[in-house]
Amino acid sequence: MTEITNLQDKVDVDETLLNIITQAVSLTLNEEGRAGVVSIALVDNNYIQSLNREYRQKDVPTDVLSFPLADDKDDEVLGDVVISLEKAAEQAKEYGHSFFREVAFLTVHGVLHLLGHDHYEEEETRIMREKEEKILSALGLER
């Protein structure tokens, strides 16, 4: 299940965007063989910068932050994903793809972090990118 809260007013949030986020979470959980509740907070750059400063000691806006809550695979609540829609819009323009693709990517990326994936090592990065592209392709949002 996906709970989405819009805490910003810089970028319009419509049904299409909400559906893409919900589908991205669902496909990611299915791909990983997991079930549970994922909370998505849609924020602006100022909001995510304050979280980034508090939790990562980085005083800059970022695109997505994940806060895992599950201790094991049986936990129902998996955690929170915070996405800056303002940053997503900037990055979509910079990377030359749609805003919807960027938000879907950030959603998948954030949920994979909730499930224990990371990209500190080269091999971990490769595995995570393959999973992201497979899910985005299933959403019809490949590059």
UniProtKB/Swiss-Prot annotation:
Name of the top EC class for this enzyme: hydrolase
Top-level taxon in the UniProt lineage: Bacteria
SUPFAM superfamilies hit by this protein: Metalloproteases ('zincins'), catalytic domain
Subcellular location per the Swiss-Prot or TrEMBL entry: Cytoplasm
Keywords attached to this entry: Cytoplasm, Endonuclease, Hydrolase, Metal-binding, Nuclease, Ribosome biogenesis, rRNA processing, Zinc
One of the protein's GO biological processes: rRNA processing
GO cellular component, one term: cytoplasm
Family annotation (InterPro entries): MetalPrtase_cat_dom_sf_prd (IPR023091), YbeY (IPR002036), YbeY_CS (IPR020549)
Known EC number: 3.1.-.-
Keyword Nuclease set for record: yes
Keyword Cytoplasm included in the entry's annotation: yes
Molecular-function GO terms, alphabetical: metalloendopeptidase activity; RNA endonuclease activity; zinc ion binding
Cofactor comment text: Binds 1 zinc ion.
Binding annotation for Zn(2+): H109, H113, H119
Cofactor(s), by name: Zn(2+)
Assigned protein family: Belongs to the endoribonuclease YbeY family.
Protein role: Single strand-specific metallo-endoribonuclease involved in late-stage 70S ribosome quality control and in maturation of the 3' terminus of the 16S rRNA.
PANTHER family for the chain: ENDORIBONUCLEASE YBEY, CHLOROPLASTIC
Designated name of the protein: Endoribonuclease YbeY
Record organism: Carboxydothermus hydrogenoformans (strain ATCC BAA-161 / DSM 6008 / Z-2901)
